[in-house]
Regions:
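Conserved donor-binding/catalytic core segment of Leloir-type glycosyltransferases
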Residues: 155, 161, 167-183, 189-193
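Conserved acidic donor-binding segment of nucleotide-sugar-dependent glycosyltransferases
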Residues: 282-283, 287-294, 302-308
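Nucleotide-sugar donor phosphate/pyrophosphate-binding loop at the beta->alpha transition
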Residues: 76-78, 85-109, 153
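Donor nucleotide-sugar binding/catalytic pocket of nucleotide-sugar-dependent glycosyltransferases
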Residues: 5, 103, 108-158
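Short hydrophobic beta-strand element within catalytic cores of glycosyltransferases
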Residues: 267-271
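Short alpha-helical donor nucleotide-sugar binding micro-motif in glycosyltransferases
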Residues: 229-230, 237-242
Length: 346
């Protein structure tokens, strides 16, 4: 396999407008496999010499050009995108008609599809793709790494909590992501304010991430803890002390922070507009509430805080079945479908 990056993934630091801060990832992104940057190679020649072209989405001119080249060269295309109707509906009127024509053009240039989950699979089916062309390749993280790293922090979790000013008996509600309107972090605060804790200790609220809503959130919840942007190596320790992760987003294609939290044995609450809900959430490990419904979120918080320990254990068991091994199975099935069992160049 040879990977061509449209942009240099190893740039030291870049400004992320969603986080509203500079981001520098601490996980190596190009180690251990054959890769090149687009600026250093010829895309036509790369595709011409490939047995199959695997694309991640079609959102840039480079990706769309790659589709055209593959069609011209007769190279089969495997498409793996995030699209789902929950997050990316076609819309109505002329705009919707134009979008459908555009999407149909993209899909007609693809030989098979690698679905990240059930909602993504439905997206393709609703647009006329045959089920025989769709292969499940779950949107996954390195579960083993997150589980191991989380477990390694177990002995110092009490000290970590106290260092944040959180008492040992306090439960922790966690949000991880960009502090932007689409993620709706503010409704967590509104839901907590509706709950009568009946003399019980109120959970601590921790926000990990940054963005345009930070000032507003600080005003709404001055007692909340804002940790700012945290890197991959830092997240397992935070998930480890959290009891419930909440992702209340509007139009969220998936939500990989849910995978991460589940691997670290955390109970989950998501809105019904979060794509992963269909595949990962059940009453055993979490709750799904109607997007924007503050009262429903409040009820979910009460339930999950009460049952967080049991739900966290089920979360970890559930996510172990949604990993890289399943991705490999799906990819092999797709390659067999293309009759390319002896693929050397992808």
């Amino acid at each position: 396999m040879r990977v061509i990056f449209e942009n240099n993934p190893e740039n030291l630091a870049y400004y992320d407008p969603g986080f509203d801060c500079k981001v520098e990832w601490d996980t190596p992104l190009t180690d251990g496999y054959n890769n090149e940057y687009l600026s250093n190679t010829n895309l036509d020649n790369e595709i011409k010499n490939a047995d199959v072209l695997w694309l991640h989405g079609w959102g840039s001119s480079v990706l769309r050009n790659a589709l055209r080249i593959a069609k011209r060269q007769g190279v089969p295309v495997l498409m793996r995108g995030e699209n789902c109707d929950i997050a990316m509906p076609d819309g109505y009127g002329l705009r919707g008609w134009l979008k459908r024509r555009y999407i149909n053009w993209v899909l007609n240039h693809c030989s098979a599809f690698l679905a990240i989950g059930s909602e993504n699979q439905k997206y393709y089916l609703h647009r006329g793709v045959g089920i025989h062309k769709i292969f499940m390749t779950p949107y996954a993280i390195d579960n083993k790494k997150f589980i191991s790293n989380s477990n390694s922090f177990e002995l110092i979790s009490g000290d970590f909590k106290s260092g944040l000013g959180i008492s040992s008996e306090q439960k922790i509600i966690l949000f991880v992501g960009k502090l932007i309107p689409r993620k709706r972090p503010d409704i967590i605060i509104k839901a907590l304010n509706k709950i009568d804790w009946k003399g019980n200790t109120k959970p601590a609220l921790v926000f990990v991430g940054d963005g345009e809503m930070r000032e507003e959130l600080v005003k709404l919840a001055p007692a909340a803890i804002f940790l700012g942007f945290k890197n991959q190596s830092e997240l397992p320790a935070i998930y480890n002390i959290a009891d419930v992760l909440i992702l209340p987003s509007h139009r969220e294609p998936w939500g990989l922070v849910v995978n991460e939290a589940m691997a670290c044995a955390t109970a989950i609450i998501v809105s019904d507009e979060v794509g992963c809900a269909t595949d990962l959430l059940n009453d055993g490990c979490g709750k799904v509430f109607p997007s924007g419904d503050v009262s429903a979120l409040a009820n979910s918080i009460v339930y999950c805080i009460k049952n967080s320990e049991t739900m966290g254990k089920i979360s970890q068991i559930t996510i172990k079945k949604w990993g890289f091994s399943e991705d490999i199975i799906g990819l092999k099935k797709a390659i067999n479908y293309l009759d390319l069992q002896d693929v050397d160049n992808t």
